[in-house]
Swiss-Prot record:
PANTHER family assigned to the protein according to its UniProt record, in alphabetical order: 39S RIBOSOMAL PROTEIN L18, MITOCHONDRIAL, LARGE RIBOSOMAL SUBUNIT PROTEIN UL18M
Entry's family note: Belongs to the universal ribosomal protein uL18 family.
InterPro entries listed in its UniProt record: Ribosomal_uL18_bac-type, Ribosomal_uL18_bac/euk
Chain's role: This is one of the proteins that bind and probably mediate the attachment of the 5S RNA into the large ribosomal subunit, where it forms part of the central protuberance.
Protein's UniProt name: Large ribosomal subunit protein uL18
Keyword check for DNA repair: no
Assembly and interaction partners: Part of the 50S ribosomal subunit; part of the 5S rRNA/L5/L18/L25 subcomplex. Contacts the 5S and 23S rRNAs.
Keywords: Ribonucleoprotein, Ribosomal protein, RNA-binding, rRNA-binding
A GO cellular component entry from the record: cytosolic large ribosomal subunit
Amino acid sequence: MAKPSKKNRTHEKRKVRVRKKLFGTQDRPRLSVFRSAKHIYAQVIIDETGQTIAGASTLDKEAKDKGGFESKVEAAKFVGKLVAQRAKEKGVTKVVFDRNGFLYHGRVKAVSTGARDGGLEF
């Protein structure tokens, strides 16, 4: 069987290291971000109960209705605002940001910026 690439191994190490320290509670749920080559996903999770309170991605109807984005970073910022809006509707204002092993740069940073602009407090 093929050995995972060094890039994937280091990503998994970062992910485990970050998740050891983060835990979403009822008061401060976890805002988790996942990015693929084409899309970005964000969801607000309570780890105590395993519930997902709110979620958004570039595949959502609102994002598609908005039309073509200038860049993936702009789309990620829109997803951040969208997940913040949905979380605030459920009564969540404070979250813990989980970058999910991805470097805090580019699209991951844009999601957090959009969520802050949308009214979530980190």
